[in-house]
From Swiss-Prot:
Compartment(s) of residence: Cytoplasm
Gene Ontology CC annotations of this record: cytosol
Function (record text): Catalyzes the attachment of valine to tRNA(Val). As ValRS can inadvertently accommodate and process structurally similar amino acids such as threonine, to avoid such errors, it has a 'posttransfer' editing activity that hydrolyzes mischarged Thr-tRNA(Val) in a tRNA-dependent manner.
Protein name, per record: Valine--tRNA ligase
Organism annotation: Helicobacter hepaticus (strain ATCC 51449 / 3B1)
Keywords: Aminoacyl-tRNA synthetase, ATP-binding, Coiled coil, Cytoplasm, Ligase, Nucleotide-binding, Protein biosynthesis
Length: 899
């Protein structure tokens, strides 16, 4: 156990986050502060209000990235705030089994040993995945701890744990029995690596390709129909060509037939309003088995559906001589063969949008496959109830995006061709019956035999995570709880709906909308009261981070260099609702300097405490603002400013304006308390006891944002030790205070004092007097003021021997005019001529610099050829030079030296 003396010695060396963060975190976690009843001391014997927030479960394969860091930081800020407010708080942690990603990780390890999953078999392979999960999965959990977040770790859930497996089965069977889950042959998005994909798992990219004009000979004619396509390799599956019924060029051909190139198969010419007459030749091929739009056309016109390649993209017998070849690799060979036989009219450059797999980047193929789907009808009530105000989005504009997507919702393909994941709970009896069951090996209701054959596919990962808001609270988990329990019987009643969800806007449709429709459909209740969607974290230039750009920011490196508090505060202060976060070294340095400012303020207060009361005073530390009397004018003023900040921070947190809360704290602690409160205390040493108590309270106010340094400094000022006393994370959060006229008058008093001091310092700087003690300063005030209070602070801080209050401007003086006063210094021995010469020389240099920059920025060639960064640099230089020139001109006017 470390002694107080050792801790004090650490303080003298300077604040080092690495000395504090891991130690304080381990103590708080061990004491159970993060758990639901961790703040029971604040409940005061009453039934507390409940607050719940769900961690978006990161992939078990993942590591902490900067987007995670933002999500978890915001979640932890609001969780700490609610916990300190006395709420019974659940911050639910968890991990996602990440079907495709996890299976691929284990597959690579096995392949490196020369082992395939097929040689192992399904059960043995899944056992290997579980083995990997226990040994290597979940690295991100320890990284979260380094960030300082406080979820109830004892309740950590995994989307493949036994309880959640039961919840998944219950949801599937319930929807299946309601006819909301069906299996059928559908046109799906197909990745040759990852199998079926839902619509939102397809990412569209601009593709610079070709448009091929192919000749399809018209039956019993010497002429050909010119058909335009971007995918010539799919013509083997054509079962028709179509034209617009209003296209005069082709009306006479409707109902006739063409002969398919190379294969010689006869296919009809049909009319369909789907055809865009301006695209290509106005005539397009119809490939119902390999195109989303053609699939619908094929059904409308009863065309055959011919599949030409398998699940891996390999051509089958329907592709003739190209059987056994990969479809994309064969494209140039197919085009060459068509050209050799005179079937290519022309080829043009063409730009279009091509769908790619969101995970592996492969081109996605429309493919007819027997899959399981959740019907879109599950979403009907969810749309209406959100719009009735049962759930609120922050920022509010996300409601429009939610509505637009939900109203265009299609059936959701939920089956995946994997081994790792929630196996679809459908069983096939030898009698031909099909049963959806929550239990394994169910009894067939038709023939009464035990069914042993289960569906081979697993569910989309988003299916299980879509139940996260309530499955983690015990829904569907019956008889699968553990010791210690992962949930309690009353959890759903207390914590559902969840109070708040915080996540990135990029998974609004992947996850948030699906949780909403799942909660509404399965529990008849929306899963959240509020949903806060934050934007992206970008680099300092506003660029999206990517490995290819080399601009990835690793949060663990930031924590190692700056500490978790600096990263948390930086992310929070930059996170305005609806705006991307531009993270830079400069912004991190500002937050780091803030931590140093707090550390130095603590040292100053303790130094003065020791000077005033000796070692005994240091041993007692500073009191709490609720237990001492604040009597000095400075103490009373800083207390009013503290409560003003408290009111504003509380309002910001209640409305999820995290950046506003951080800005208010920064402004108060640095700009008001450190820059003015501590400075003014040099002229009011009796106020030190009061300022120390106020600063302790301010550290509690800041604590949700910067938990480690606030806890450490609070204990230093309190003369206590985290080893033997409670953390401030279970201290009551400062309460709001109603402002009155007396408070406003006190604020105005110190605004005047600060204004006079600032004015005198500005005047001394203009006259190059530096820190020289001035014999006399004349001050003309705009309104009556208590002179003794003014003299007490001004003479000490502005270094003035005599303060003379005047009603008019004295003779032979130079002055400074500000909001509340005019301050004057008699010229006496001041060499105005030397000052004037210096200012005029500076002005000439600046004027030359401005002329040069203006000429450069007005030069058309420079504007045309200069990189953007160079342009911005020169524009900034011009702005700064103009500001300096304006200041010099103002000083010359004030000194009466303008010429």
């Amino acid at each position: 156990m470390e002694s107080k003396a050792q801790e004090k010695q650490e303080q003298k060396k300077g604040y080092n986050p690495q000395d504090i963060e891991s130690r304080f975190y381990a103590i708080c976690e061990k004491r159970g502060y993060f758990e639901i009843e961790g703040n029971k001391s604040l409940w005061q014997g009453c039934a507390p209000k409940c607050f719940s927030i769900m961690m978006p479960p990161p992939n078990v394969t993942g590591v902490l990235h900067i987007g995670h860091a933002l999500t978890f930081t915001l979640q932890d800020i609001i969780t700490r705030f609610k916990r300190m407010e006395g709420f019974k708080t659940l911050y639910q942690p968890g991990l996602d089994h990440a079907g495709i990603a996890t299976q691929n990780v284990v597959l690579k390890q096995l392949l490196a040993q020369g082992i395939t999953k097929e040689s192992l078999g399904r059960e043995a392979f899944i056992a290997k995945v579980w083995e990997w999960k226990e040994q290597s999965g979940g690295e991100i959990l320890n990284q979260m701890r380094h960030l300082g977040i406080t979820p109830a770790w004892s309740r950590l859930r995994f989307t493949m744990d036994k309880g959640l497996q039961k919840a998944v089965k219950k949801a599937f069977v319930q929807w299946y029995n309601q006819g909301l889950i069906v299996q059928d042959n559908y046109m799906v998005n197909w990745c040759v690596n990852d199998g079926a994909l839902s619509d939102i798992e397809v990412e569209y990219e601009q593709n610079h390709g070709k448009l091929y004009y192919l000749r399809y000979p018209i039956k019993d004619s010497a002429q050909s129909l010119i058909v335009a396509t971007t995918r010539p390799e799919t013509f083997f599956g054509d079962t028709g060509v179509m034209v617009n019924p209003n296209d005069e060029r082709y009306k006479h051909l409707i109902g006739k037939s063409v002969i398919l190139p190379l294969l010689g198969r006869e296919i009809p010419i049909i009319a369909d309003s789907h055809v865009d007459m301006s695209f290509g030749s106005g005539c397009v091929k119809v490939t119902p088995a390999h195109d989303m739009n053609d699939y619908e056309v094929g059904k409308r016109h009863n065309l055959p559906f011919i599949t030409i390649f398998d699940e891996k993209g390999i051509f089958n017998k329907n592709a003739g001589i190209f059987q056994g070849q990969e479809r994309l690799e064969s494209r140039p060979l197919i085009v060459q063969k068509l050209q050799e036989n005179g079937f290519v009219e022309k080829i043009e450059d063409y730009t279009n949008q091509v769908g790619k797999c969101y995970r592996c980047g492969n081109i996605v193929e429309p493919y007819i496959s027997k899959q399981w789907f959740v019907k879109k009808e599950t979403a009907h009530n969810a749309i209406q109830r959100v719009n009735n105000g049962e759930l609120h989005f922050y920022p509010a504009q996300w409601l429009n995006n939610y509505n637009a997507w939900m109203r265009e919702l299609k059936d959701w393909c939920i089956s995946r061709q994997l081994w790792w994941g929630h196996r679809i709970p459908v069983w096939y009896c030898e009698c031909g019956n099909k049963v959806a069951s929550e239990s394994d090996n169910p009894i067939c209701p038709q023939c009464q035999s035990t069914i042993t054959k289960q569906d081979e596919d697993v569910l989309d990962t988003w299916f299980s995570s879509g139940l996260w808001a309530f499955s983690t609270l015990g829904w569907g988990n019956e008889d699968t709880n553990t010791q210690p329990p992962l949930y309690h019987a009353n959890d759903l009643a207390e914590f559902y709906p969840n109070s708040l969800l915080i996540t990135g806007f990029d998974i609004l449709f992947f996850w948030v909308a699906r949780m909403i429709l799942s909660g509404e459909s399965l529990l008849d209740s929306l899963p959240f009261k509020d949903v806060y969607l934050h934007a992206l974290v970008r680099d300092e230039n506003g660029q999206k981070m990517s490995k290819s750009k080399g601009n990835i920011i690793d949060p663990m490196e930031i924590i190692s260099s700056y500490g978790a508090d600096t990263l948390r505060f930086t992310l929070a202060i930059l996170c305005a609702q609806g705006r991307d976060v531009k993270l830079s070294t400069q912004s991190l340095e500002i937050s780091k300097n803030f931590t140093n400012k707090l550390y130095n303020a603590t040292n100053f207060l303790n130094m003065y405490l020791e000077q005033l009361g000796g070692k005994e005073a240091l041993k007692k530390g500073f009191g709490d603002i609720n237990h001492i009397h604040i009597n000095t004018p400075l103490g009373q003023y800083m207390l009013v400013r503290f409560y003003t900040a408290t009111n504003e921070v509380r309002a910001a947190l209640e409305n999820y304006r995290f950046n506003d809360g951080a800005s208010i704290l920064y402004r108060f602690l640095w700009g008001e308390f450190c820059d003015w409160g501590i400075e003014l205390a040099k002229a009011s040493k009796d106020s030190i006891y009061e300022l120390g108590a106020i600063f302790k309270a301010a550290l509690i106010l800041l604590h949700p944002y910067m938990p480690f340094i606030t806890d450490a400094l609070w204990h230093t000022l309190n003369a206590s030790d985290i080893q033997t006393s409670d953390s401030i994370m279970i201290h009551s959060y400062p309460k709001a205070m109603e402002k009155n006229e007396q408070h406003s008058q006190l604020e105005r008093t110190f605004e005047v004092i600060q204004d006079v001091i600032t004015s005198i310092r500005r005047l001394k700087a203009m006259l190059e007097l530096g820190s020289t003690n001035i014999e006399c300063i004349f001050v003309k005030l705009n309104a009556p003021f208590e002179h003794s209070l003014l003299e007490q602070f001004v003479c000490k801080l502005a270094k003035v021997k005599t303060l003379c209050i005047t009603q008019q401007k004295p003779k032979d003086c130079v002055g400074d005019v500000s909001k509340y006063c005019e301050c004057y210094i008699q010229l006496g021995e001041i060499d105005l001529q030397a000052i004037g010469t210096r200012l005029h020389n500076q002005r000439q240099k600046l004027e030359k610099e401005i002329t040069k920059l203006q000429a450069m920025l007005g030069n058309e060639n420079f504007i045309k050829n200069a990189p953007k960064a160079v342009m911005e640099q020169n524009q900034s230089a011009l702005h700064n030079a103009q500001e300096k020139l304006d200041k010099i001109n103002a000083e010359l006017i004030a000194l009466g030296l303008q010429s």
